[in-house]
Amino acid sequence: MLYDLIQHHGSAHVTVLNLFRYITFRAGAACLTALAISLLLGNPLIAQLRRIQREGQPIRALGPERHILEKAGTPTMGGVLILAALFGSTLLWADLTDGYVWAVLLTTLSFGAVGFADDYLKLSRRNTAGVSKRMRLGCEFAASLVGGYWMQSLMPADLANHLAFPFLKEWLLPLGFAFPLFAMITITGFGNAVNFTDGLDGLAIVPVIIAALVFGLISYLVGNHVFADYLQLHAVPGTGELCVFCSALVGAGLGFLWFNAPPAAVFMGDTGSLSLGGALGAIAVAVKHELVLCIVGGLFVVETLSVIIQVFWFRRTGRRVFLMAPLHHHFEKKGWQEPKIVIRFWIVSIVLGLCGLATLKLR
């Protein structure tokens, strides 16, 4: 918004206003703005959620026993705070004429709406059964398919239907008409992967922040022909503005972590986890680094695989591979304390983020 106002009404002779033309300046401002919004709205919103929800998020009876004692009464739907900060900051600092920004914003909002409906039904019914799996996946598939097709229409023709591989600078796999389906699987998959990971205080939000930092840099590089050519990346004009979105996501995530750090004052709920995962998937599709997201977001991938393996093996043999799935609950059952699990998973995410950055140079 500010960028568009200055572009159309600002004076080229005012040096300070020229700062708004730089993505790096607006990205930094977006991060700080989102952080400020989160910190300012956090306490009032949490107080309001406590008044409305009273008993807090329903706790799964089959989950770790201590969750019933320690987490009962904690309000959920904290994802509303993340989305408010993310959208407010992005709309303020991003170039709103950029199609990629709108495609990612609306995909994020759509996943957030599905998560909000799921949280609302869980609270109103006072159990952990929200929107039916079929309805939930149907809505996610529809939103991600539209988002994927939208972003495909914005891409250069020589990239639009192709899949790029990390470490390989030249080779592209042509997907043809299947690309929107691939985008749908990527976005929906990561939406649910973050949802699976969000089971302990602070566990999901820090890996999301790390992924947003990495993809903020990637979007800046692939959106700039000079940097893309130097690093031998596939340039995607227009995606540089997603750096502003990613920076806003970092700020919103840090602000939420202020209240979600153990012991959490609020949970993000499906409102937050689905929207954040959907956002990461959409950004990866836009910048043609979907497989790099599997590296950077490897923690989310492993958590999801633990659920798939557990369900498949139990249905096949009647036995469990893990003490409990997702994986973080397995370690809880083994006797690890929650802070140890969370911090060690954060360390893994940092290492995976660095590995993702390494793919930009090792080509």
UniProtKB/Swiss-Prot annotation:
Transmembrane segments: 27-47, 76-96, 97-117, 137-157, 171-191, 202-222, 226-246, 248-268, 271-291, 292-312, 340-360
Keywords, ordered alphabetically: Cell cycle, Cell division, Cell inner membrane, Cell membrane, Cell shape, Cell wall biogenesis/degradation, Magnesium, Membrane, Metal-binding, Peptidoglycan synthesis, Transferase, Transmembrane, Transmembrane helix
Metabolic or biological pathway, per its Swiss-Prot or TrEMBL entry: Cell wall biogenesis; peptidoglycan biosynthesis
EC number annotated for this UniProt entry: 2.7.8.13
Compartment(s) of residence: Cell inner membrane
A biological process term (GO) from this entry: regulation of cell shape
PROSITE patterns the record matches: MRAY_1, MRAY_2
Keyword Cell cycle in record: yes
Record GO terms (molecular function): metal ion binding; phospho-N-acetylmuramoyl-pentapeptide-transferase activity; UDP-N-acetylmuramoyl-L-alanyl-D-glutamyl-meso-2,6-diaminopimelyl-D-alanyl-D-alanine:undecaprenyl-phosphate transferase activity
CDD domains named in the record: GT_MraY
Keyword NADP belongs to the record: no
Function: Catalyzes the initial step of the lipid cycle reactions in the biosynthesis of the cell wall peptidoglycan: transfers peptidoglycan precursor phospho-MurNAc-pentapeptide from UDP-MurNAc-pentapeptide onto the lipid carrier undecaprenyl phosphate, yielding undecaprenyl-pyrophosphoryl-MurNAc-pentapeptide, known as lipid I.
Protein name in UniProt: Phospho-N-acetylmuramoyl-pentapeptide-transferase
Gene from which this protein is expressed: mraY
